[in-house]
Curated annotation (Swiss-Prot):
A Gene Ontology term for the protein's cellular component: cytoplasm
Species this chain originates from: Streptococcus gordonii (strain Challis / ATCC 35105 / BCRC 15272 / CH1 / DL1 / V288)
PANTHER family in the cross-refs: RIBONUCLEASE 3, RIBONUCLEASE III
Pfam families: dsrm (PF00035), Ribonucleas_3_3 (PF14622)
EC assignment: 3.1.26.3
Highest taxon of source: Bacteria
Record-given protein name: Ribonuclease 3
Family the entry assigns: Belongs to the ribonuclease III family.
MF terms in GO: double-stranded RNA binding; metal ion binding; ribonuclease III activity; rRNA binding
Subcellular location per the Swiss-Prot or TrEMBL entry: Cytoplasm
Catalytic residue positions: D51, E123
Sites where the protein binds Mg(2+): E47, D120, E123
Amino acid sequence: MKKLENLLFDRFGLVFKDVSLLETAFTHTSYANEHRLLKISHNERLEFLGDAVLQLIISEYLFEKYPKRPEGDLTKLRSTIVREESLAGFSRDCQFDRFIKLGKGEEKSGGRERETILGDLFEAFLGALLLDKGLEVVKNFIYQVMIPKVEAGDFEQVTDYKTKLQELLQSNGDVEILYQVVSESGPAHAKNFEVSVSVDGRLVGKGQGRSKKLAEQEAAKNAFEKENHSCI
């Protein structure tokens, strides 16, 4: 836990008064269940709190940033920013994935890379930060870590190429679309995945990304652009 405390201070200038909150935020249910006799707290309640404060801060930001955009557009953009995949990416950016405590089974099954776990971890950290430091510090952290990517347009006009590819290919009948991980590279906190997509056994595209889902979308985009062009 000392290494995590050092990371938080060095990168974000954060020092927790109540380190037990930090400990709880980084404890997955699988770890707590394996150490039931020790009555260790896990991070689900903090995740609940963090989710609420994240929704509030992002909603306020979008409301002030885009005064002329309708409610529907703001809701879609907020959903993209706070979705599981996005929050998992922020966890990796902060190197939080290095410090989460997992049960042995969860660790062996790749839990440290699982987007559900990493997204929940990010929210749990925000919950712990809120209890320890208050709303303004949480807001500053979110503005430091998340908002630069929002303002860079990373979450605008997100296209679901997997769905677009499926609709294009299945317009002439049922086909089997298969996504496979070709390779993984990089350290645990900055993984890069390469994924291929094939249709009825025929390779139609490849893509890379910081997560399997992002790599699948890139592969689908690559395939969609080629297949759509061939249909013209």
